[in-house]
Design a protein with these regions (language model features):
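Hydrophobic alpha-helical connector segments
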Residues: 50, 54, 61-89, 142-145
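Secondary-structure edge/capping motif, primarily at the C-terminal ends of alpha-helices
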Residues: 66, 91-99, 152, 156-159
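C-terminal peripheral helix-coil segments that are non-catalytic and often amphipathic
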Residues: 75, 117, 121-129, 147, ...
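Hydrophobic recognition helices of helix-based DNA-binding modules
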Residues: 51, 55, 59, 63, ...
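Amphipathic, non-transmembrane alpha-helical scaffold segments
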Residues: 48, 52, 56, 105-116, ...
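Helix-turn-helix
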Residues: 4, 8, 12-46, 50
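Short secondary-structure transition hinges
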Residues: 85-120
């Protein structure tokens, strides 16, 4: 039941955002009482926290699985930046968490750091194999990747540029790799 509650919450969060979905809507959708929800979650905030925890765990798992498969450097970079799984968090929801759920947003920041560290590892691997120019300044490129992560989660930037997060990531990966691949 806990998983079903979380699945419905994820759908509602995607539709309405973090602050506008209600426990009544979850109960109505699942045809259960709010009391049943409270048997599994202490509060709406606990559901939000579980939603983010699930999404971020799945995100890291997706990255690890894609890196485990033999892939090109470009595929590894793309898989790290844009991981695909069932609980993708919309950019608008990440922004909402940043404003209204700062403790939850800290987990998003930890996941972002995991991805930045993973990218640094991929870049080092590329330098060692000769796929990436050895003259590339690693800390500068890592900082650039960190800023890119901020940009693709900036809702205003995406609206202004008329890009989805996925399209923005594809563009950034293309720009970076065409500039550093031998």
């Amino acid at each position: 039941m806990k998983e079903r509650i979380l699945e419905v919450a994820a759908q509602l969060i995607g539709q309405y955002g973090l602050r506008k979905f209600t426990l009544d809507e979850i109960a109505r959708e699942l045809k259960i009482s709010k009391k049943t929800i409270y048997q599994h979650f202490d509060s709406k905030e606990a559901i939000v926290r579980a939603y983010f925890e699930t999404a971020l765990i799945m995100d890291q798992k997706s990255v690890r699985e894609h890196l485990g498969a033999s892939r090109t450097l470009a595929e590894k970079v793309h898989a790290t930046i844009f991981s695909e799984h069932d609980f993708c968090i919309p950019v608008s929801v990440i922004q909402e968490a940043k404003l209204f759920y700062p403790d939850v947003y800290k987990e998003v920041e930890r996941c972002k750091q995991f991805k930045i560290d993973t990218l640094a590892s991929i870049i080092k691997e590329g330098i060692a194999s000769g796929s990436i120019q050895a003259s590339i300044h690693l800390s500068l490129l890592s900082a650039l990747c960190e800023k890119i992560a901020d940009i693709v989660t900036d809702y205003d930037f995406l609206i202004d540029s008329k890009l989805t997060a996925h399209e923005a990531i594809d563009e950034f990966v293309s720009i970076i790799l065409k500039g550093i691949l031998n």
